[in-house]
Every structure is written in structure tokens, then in C-alpha cells.
Amino acid sequence: RICDDSSIPFLRTPQLCPKGQDVCYKKTPIVKKFKWLQKKGCASSCPKNGFIKIFKIECCTKDNCI
């Protein structure tokens, strides 16, 4: 799998994911002024919010899908 791992919203930096990490994800803070703190990368499963939902989380299973 190839996923983007850039933390900058408009920049794409594709990376080859380690074996077993077949999900691409993007975590974006819900508060708009903190959107630049987004995190993208590879995972073995889609990350989840904790007790309080502070991130919008998107996941997919195709190369460069987010």
C-alpha cells in the first residue's frame, strides 16, 4: 500500500507502507483553526477517536486515496 504521510494539508508525500499496514488514514482536528495539525499515514486498522471526538478521521484501502 502507498499512503500520503504529509502533515501539511496541501502537500502530498507518498510512502510505501510497512507490511501489514494496509489502511491509509487522515486525522484532521474538528476545530478549523487547528486543521494544519492534521496527521496522515499508514495503519493496520482505521484509527478511532478517544472518549471525546476531536478529530475527523478518514480511512481507505487504495493507494494514494486520501
UniProtKB/Swiss-Prot annotation:
It is found in: Secreted. Expressed by the venom gland. It comes from Micrurus clarki. Keywords: Disulfide bond, Secreted. Disulfide bonds join C3-C24, C17-C42, C46-C59, C60-C65. This is Clarkitoxin-1. One of its GO terms (molecular function) is toxin activity. One of its GO terms (cellular component) is extracellular region. It comes from the Eukaryota. The keyword Oxidoreductase does not apply. Not toxic to mice when injected intravenously or intraperitoneally. Belongs to the three-finger toxin family. Short-chain subfamily.
